Amino acid sequence: MHCHVKTWGAIHQKSVKSTSVNSALYVLYNVLGKRRGEVNAMEKLIITACICGAEVTKEHNPAVPYTVEEIAKEAKSAYDAGASIIHLHVREDDGTPTQSKERFEACINAIKEVCPDVIIQPSTGGAVGMSNEERLAPTTLRPEMATLDCGTCNFGGDEIFVNTENMIIDFANTMNEYGIKPEIEVFDKGMVDMAIRLHKKGYIKAPMHFDFVMGVNGGISGEPRDLLFMANSIPAGSTWTVSGVGRFEYPMVTMGILMGGHV
């Protein structure tokens, strides 16, 4: 579940070619201390855009889209700027977060009308307090991807984003049934360990794709050492993307690119 834009950029599956970037990649991967195959600086950078989140309102930022038309417009803008994946939360016209299958279907259809080859990744995090059934509703549309949150997090005050082990297994089984590729959303190292444990039990299939969400209240911070630690904690053959909350967004995105990850 996100309340922020994962990333914006002017690269649409473009290669990283800069000599300075290549040098930084070499240094960073040696700092990691664990080589996972040869570093290929020509791998494509995949950009994911979260265009509205579940909590941010127009009072916070007038550009936050609510209506189907606004969401499709922002998705097209992100796609034109370089996004290959749209991480999708949806709202009612008044801005109320919803996991309605019908609302997701309307938004997905509208997005596909203007950018047919973009990958749609609905959130199954929804908003704090939603039931499992509500959160899973968009998976019945069989999108290409969906988020799989792998642990519980204290978001602040009395808000707890609940994801028990049995819930995670239920969500993973649903995604397997519908042929959906999960983006494994992790807010701290313990959630990485949970995902690996469930992979070993057969609930999450390889190759695993992680999203390191850095700087969430109650989760791991968004300092360079934190991203190095997270990236060095996932199994060989996995892919990862990184997003930072608030002030951590640009530092984490920059470092993620230098490390050969996605954003």
Placement of each model-derived feature along the sequence:
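Active-site mouth loops of central-metabolism enzymes
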Residues: 54-70, 124-130, 157-161, 219, ...
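Alpha-helix-loop-beta-strand connector modules within alpha/beta enzyme cores
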Residues: 97-122, 171-175, 230-236
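Short hydrophobic alpha-helical segments enriched in small aliphatic residues
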Residues: 3-5, 13-27, 31
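N-terminal small/glycine-rich loop or linker at the start of catalytic domains
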Residues: 41-63, 147-154
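Glycine-rich, proline-tolerant flexible connector loops at the mouths of alpha/beta enzymes
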Residues: 59, 85-105, 213-214
